[in-house]
Amino acid sequence: MAWLQVHQTLKDHRKLFDAADQLEVEPPHMMGLLVSFWLWALDNAPTGSLSDITPRMISRAAQWDGDPEKLAKTLIRAGWIDEKEDGTLEIHDWY
């Protein structure tokens, strides 16, 4: 069984606040979106690579019902997802 480590500082992290502000949601909601996405990634992106994963898939994985492009861009801008030089995406500091 896979597990996910969530640091106690997540709830007060500036990246969480930044993403929450961009999406116009409260920080606890943003934390839920992130944890849902990370739990999905354990099985569906185990290396952290998001190549071939669309913004719509990221949105569904996070259980976000807003604009998928906005969520993906927000996660990149806030630093939760890294965009490599070749345009592929990776979950920041995954494993």
What spans do the regions from the language model cover?
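Positively charged, structured surface patches that bind polyanionic biopolymers
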Residues: 1-86, 90-95
